[in-house]
């Protein structure tokens, strides 16, 4: 009591107060951050000086307006779309050509439903098919304005001059009638006003044949409304022997007696050499008749807007030749072949001139020739080395359908598209089979 009255604290009490202070410090938690505080812990806030502040707003981690779920990317292609129509045409073409040669599109080949249902998942294949479809449509748009209403070609040359044509066909294949049809059907542009008919001998043309030539030559200078399309009402028909045609006077453009120069001063001319294969193979070199003379006459006389040479051969590979027939083939811008010719010669020609399109398509052209040989005796396969459009390089002539293009370039595009489809889907099928085999092995 005396200690308390004196104002001093007893030793025991002092020790108790110190121990309680230490325990209070030990029980007080140490906060390392805002996240470490609990609900029962005092808030780590600034001292309140009488101003009341609301709690700090906290934004939710999720979006207030959640985005709508996006549908998965579509793998299908509409058949009515531009690419869908192209794929449909390719598959239809594939079903037709495999009947000719199954090696063109080998099995296994995916079905139509599988192609249209899963093609959207192959971006590289879609890009390749779009490129093929673009090239296909571009070629179609370029060729369509140059065709007639029935889809046939208007002419053989489409204004290409000078124009040298070689016709191959055995005896009895209708070569003479075909040449007359070429003149009368205006298949040479422009129509000739003078026609030179060269034979081995001058008197070998009978009066009946001469009248037929004159009548069909006159038919070729009038349109369907009987309106003349040239400066003459009756084209001149001149019969020459082979020796006269290749005479030195007629091979020199400066000779005043050159019959070809005299006719070129009046208008377009056409020279037809028929039944002269033996003379071409046995005579001296007359290569200038096929390359120097046509270009010089066509370039010197403005009235001669057309210079056409039609040469008839019975055989593609004659036994004797001094270089004239070889030069003729080199200078020829158009080769017309009868299906009645020997099959080996036709096949060799197609293989030699099939550059630019896939080799499997050779069987398609051969099938056309074989079909024509069996069903159409007076039909012809036409190859043009300088076409105005690539689609017109190969064509087919028949008296019923006239001159129809084969569109080999478009078939090459379809072949490329089918090849790409098969490559991608067969690889996918192989992956599926390989995966299934591995699962069986592990199981």
Curated annotation (Swiss-Prot):
SUPFAM superfamilies on file: P-loop containing nucleoside triphosphate hydrolases
Subcellular location, record wording: Virion; Host nucleus, Host nucleoplasm; Host nucleus, Host nucleolus
Annotated GO MF terms: ATP binding; DNA binding
Record-level GO cellular component terms: host cell nucleolus; host cell nucleoplasm; virion component
Subunit structure: Homodimer. Part of a genome packaging complex composed of packaging proteins 1, 2 and 3; this complex specifically binds to the packaging sequence on the left end of viral genomic DNA and performs packaging of the viral genome. Interacts with protein 33K.
Family of the protein in this entry: Belongs to the adenoviridae packaging protein 1 family.
Protein name per the record: Packaging protein 1
Organism: Snake adenovirus serotype 1
């Amino acid at each position: 009591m005396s200690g308390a009255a004196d104002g001093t604290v007893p030793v025991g009490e002092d020790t108790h107060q110190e121990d309680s202070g230490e325990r209070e410090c030990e029980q007080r938690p140490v906060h390392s951050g805002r996240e470490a505080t609990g609900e029962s812990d005092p808030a780590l806030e600034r001292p309140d000086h009488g101003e009341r502040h609301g709690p700090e707003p906290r934004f939710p981690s999720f979006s207030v307006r959640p985005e709508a779920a996006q549908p998965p990317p579509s793998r299908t292609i509409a058949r009515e779309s531009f690419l869908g129509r192209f794929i449909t045409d390719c598959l239809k073409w594939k079903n037709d050509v495999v009947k000719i040669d199954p090696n063109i599109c080998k099995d296994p080949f995916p079905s139509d439903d599988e192609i249209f249902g899963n093609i959207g998942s192959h971006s590289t294949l879609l890009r390749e098919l779009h490129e093929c479809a673009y090239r296909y449509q571009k070629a179609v748009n370029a060729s369509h304005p140059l065709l007639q209403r029935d889809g046939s070609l208007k002419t053989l040359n489409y204004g290409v001059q000078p124009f040298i044509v070689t016709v191959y066909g055995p005896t009895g294949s209708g070569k003479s009638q075909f040449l007359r049809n070429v003149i009368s059907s205006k298949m040479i542009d422009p129509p000739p006003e003078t026609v030179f008919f060269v034979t081995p001998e001058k008197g070998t043309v009978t009066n009946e044949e001469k009248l037929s030539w004159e009548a069909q030559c006159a038919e070729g200078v009038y349109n369907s409304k009987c309106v003349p399309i040239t400066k003459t009402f009756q084209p001149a028909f001149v019969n020459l022997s082979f020796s006269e045609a290749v005479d030195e006077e007629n091979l020199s453009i400066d000779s005043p007696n050159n019959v070809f120069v005299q006719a070129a001063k009046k208008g377009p001319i056409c020279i037809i050499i028929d039944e002269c294969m033996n003379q071409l193979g046995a005579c001296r070199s007359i290569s200038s008749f096929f390359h120097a003379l046509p270009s010089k006459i066509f370039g010197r006389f403005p009235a001669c807007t057309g210079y056409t040479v039609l040469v008839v051969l019975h055989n593609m590979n004659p036994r004797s030749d001094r270089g004239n027939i070889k030069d003729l083939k080199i200078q020829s811008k158009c080769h017309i072949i009868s299906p009645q010719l020997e099959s080996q010669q036709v096949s060799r020609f197609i293989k030699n001139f099939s550059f630019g399109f896939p080799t499997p398509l050779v069987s398609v052209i051969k099938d056309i020739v074989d079909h024509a040989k069996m069903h159409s005796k007076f039909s012809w396969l036409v190859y043009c080395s300088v076409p105005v459009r690539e689609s017109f390089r190969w064509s087919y002539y028949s008296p019923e359908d006239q001159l129809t293009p084969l569109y080999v370039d478009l078939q090459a595009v379809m072949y490329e598209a089918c090849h790409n489809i098969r490559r991608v889907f067969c690889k996918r099928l192989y992956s599926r089979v390989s995966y299934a085999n591995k699962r069986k092995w592990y199981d």
